[in-house]
């Protein structure tokens, strides 16, 4: 009998970095077989765990091997779940509905490879997944949300290009089913977060408005939680390559200090 977080299949995956080993893993989440990508430094050692929670929906924003290898090269064992219904995984992606448990149980996958420190990172839609993971677990060391979504209702109104998909997945508009949007919004549950949170966001972001970051900071502050903000006046959703690399290094250092 398999349980949540059990690994049921592994296969070697081509790596863009000769110093990093990639493995595609199939694991169990609520009775579904979910897939994800594991990145491990080949140099022997004990490493912290890094849960990489991707942005996007279905094929948009899919996990990029080069990106998770980049984080692994900073000295982490990285696991990036694809979420249910993606790349051969069972079930349906629900935009932070029951699929939040694919992130929650991915921590149990990661623990089979790393030491006791588990850092959770979410980019864009991954931000909402990262916050839910930190709300639903007590064993998270730190959380970083970069250009992260924190409010499902705001995303619906901001992203006209995502409305059809969100209506289909969530079951209607925020006006028709406000409770379904509230149930996906982690802001109302941040008092359960036990890990420090780093919020990274660019003021010029047109995909995820800076207000997602400011609201998250407000709610964390109100709940007396430990958090830090790295806002940038000039950058949008995707930082330029040099700034991106610099931010990756800086956030990884921040994680290691917690």
Give names to the regions the model predicted.
Residues 2-43:
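N-terminal cap/lid segment of alpha/beta-hydrolase-fold proteins
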Residues 45-47, 52-91, 153:
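Short substrate-entry loop that stabilizes the transition state in hydrolases
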Residues 94-113:
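Alpha/beta-hydrolase active-site loop
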Residues 114-124:
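Alpha/beta-hydrolase fold nucleophile elbow
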Residues 127-138:
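Short glycine-enriched nucleophile-adjacent loop
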Residues 153-189, 195:
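Mobile cap/lid helix-loop segments that gate and shape the active-site cleft of serine hydrolases
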Residues 193, 199-201, 205:
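Short beta-strand/loop motif that positions the catalytic acidic residue
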Residues 214, 223-258:
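C-terminal catalytic histidine-bearing segment of alpha/beta-hydrolase fold enzymes
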